[in-house]
Amino acid sequence: MEMTREQFFNEITELSSRGRHFNVSSSDIGNVNLYLQGCVIKANAEEGINGELNIYKPYTNMEVTIDFDIIEEITKQDNTYTLSFVNGLSDVDIEVIQ
């Protein structure tokens, strides 16, 4: 199912406020395979239009920031959101976990 940035922002904000964690993966972020388990996500935006997504793994220095401006498409299937980007970066999957 395709989603707007605003829908995605609202859902991630709601899930985060309820203390949910996420597994985040991509085959290529800065030429490195990325797989972060048990991440916390904070969306900083004005109604999901402008802003960024801050993804960090508690108790580590692992942090990834994604600007909303480069997100081309957002899809959701089951408990996983897939972000596609305008600049050709590999898709990022964000899986909701307990």
Language-model-detected regions and their locations in the chain:
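Amphipathic, interaction-prone secondary-structure segments
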Residues: 27-56
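Edge beta-strand at a domain terminus
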Residues: 87-98
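Short, exposed beta-strand-loop hairpins at the edges of beta-sheets
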Residues: 80-87
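A short, Trp-centered hydrophobic/proline-enriched beta-strand micro-motif
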Residues: 17-26
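Surface-exposed beta-loop interaction hotspot
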Residues: 1-2
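Structured surface patches comprising rigid loops and adjacent beta-strands/short helices at the edges
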Residues: 37-44, 60-79, 97
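N-terminal helix-cap/turn-to-beta initiation motif at the start of protein domains
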Residues: 5-17
